[in-house]
Structures are given as C-alpha cells and as structure tokens.
Regions:
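Short, flexible helix-loop junctions that flank or precede catalytic/ligand sites
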Residues: 1-206
Length: 206
C-alpha cells in the first residue's frame, strides 16, 4: 500500500531507528521496496522521571561522565540529580512513595529518509552506514535525547544507563561519528580539535 502512495503506519521491535532497516531485511522486505516506500522511522522508549521533591543534586565523577561520552568541563554548569534512596529510619517521600522516581518520560529518535539515505538503503547499506548518514543529517539518538533530559533534571544517569546505554549501542554511535572526525587510537571515538586526550578512554592524543 505504501508503494502506491498510501500513508502506512506500523510498529516493529528494534534496538534503535537505524536498526529497523536490518529488521525489515530479516523479514524479507527487499531493499528497493524499503527505499521507495519508507519516509521515516521513530524509535521510542520510556524512562522513569526522577522525583522532583526528593531528588539529590550531585557532581558525577569524570569516569561516570565518560561512560556516557560526556566531559566534565563541558557539563560544569549542569546540575545533575540522582534518586534519593531512603534509609530505614527516614520518612518516606509522600510523592514517590520512597522509590525516588515518579512517572515516566518519553525519549525519541527520529530518522528521516532523505535522498542520500534512500540510495544507501537501496544498495543494502549496513546499519553502521545508515547510522552514520542519520547522524550527519542531524538525527538525535536515544542516548543524546535522554542525556538532554538528564541535563534538564528530569531523569538520572543511572536510569539512562539502565534503559538506554549499552556497550554495543554507544560503541556503534561512537564509530559512526568517528568516520567523519579525528579518531582516538585507543577506543575509536571521534575527537575534536583542541582535545589533548580522549574523554572516553583517556588515551593521550598524538
């Protein structure tokens, strides 16, 4: 139906938006059909929202920030929060019932199929190539979206690590970004002009 001009909305389980192309291929959908009919992909998840009444401000260590691809110097003005863990003799927060979290907030990754992307899909491009093209066109990843919520005080690094951050996922994102930037010899992460060492693995830059 999509090939004949109808707007078709469907759901599919995949780790992120770029991985959806591979999932369609596994289901037997030919690449040329995907490139001709697909206009966009939205990947979404839910994170627990940290309780605004009992959350605790703190300063993450560089190692913790590095795990998420963040640099302490760039996050100096950000107030990070973590969930409050109540002790046995402490009154329970009436708003979150002592869980430290109340409600949920959505995170989204929107991949728009543009001409260059469609051409790559029709040629059977790998997920890494699809991800690289998506990042170059301005796609905000699930990790990037969730870290922005952390900066706004809506959730925690702990929750992002639990629900979003995976070694393979972060490595794929780093690899895609590194293809068009200077690359760390230690972990392959993309580097920027002026960095003396890799913020992710602390390997000195040569």
């Amino acid at each position: 139906a999509a090939l004949t001009g109808h707007l078709v909305l469907s759901t599919l389980h995949a780790n992120d938006a770029p991985s959806t192309i591979a999932r369609l291929d596994e289901m037997g959908v030919e690449p040329f059909m995907v490139s001709a009919s697909l206009i966009g992909i939205i990947s979404q998840r839910l994170l627990r929202r940290v309780c605004s009444h009992c959350r605790e401000p703190y300063r993450p260590e560089e190692r913790e920030l590095g795990r998420f691809g963040l640099m302490a110097s760039r996050e100096a003005d950000v107030t990070f929060y973590r969930a409050h863990h109540h002790s046995p003799n402490e009154p329970i927060c009436p708003h979150c019932q002592g869980s430290g979290y109340k409600g949920r907030v959505g995170i989204y990754e929107v991949l728009r199929i543009q001409e260059e992307m469609a051409t790559a899909i029709s040629k059977g491009a790998s997920t890494d190539v699809i991800r690289q093209l998506a990042l170059e066109s301005g796609m905000v990843t699930l990790l990037g979206y969730s870290l922005e919520l952390v900066r706004r005080g809506e959730t925690t690094l702990e929750e992002v690590g639990r629900m979003v951050l995976t070694d393979s996922g972060l490595e794929s994102e780093r690899r895609a970004r590194a293809l068009s930037t200077m690359t760390c010899e230690g972990c392959g992460a993309g580097l920027q002009e002026g960095w003396l060492e890799c913020p992710y693995c602390l390997t000195p830059r040569h």
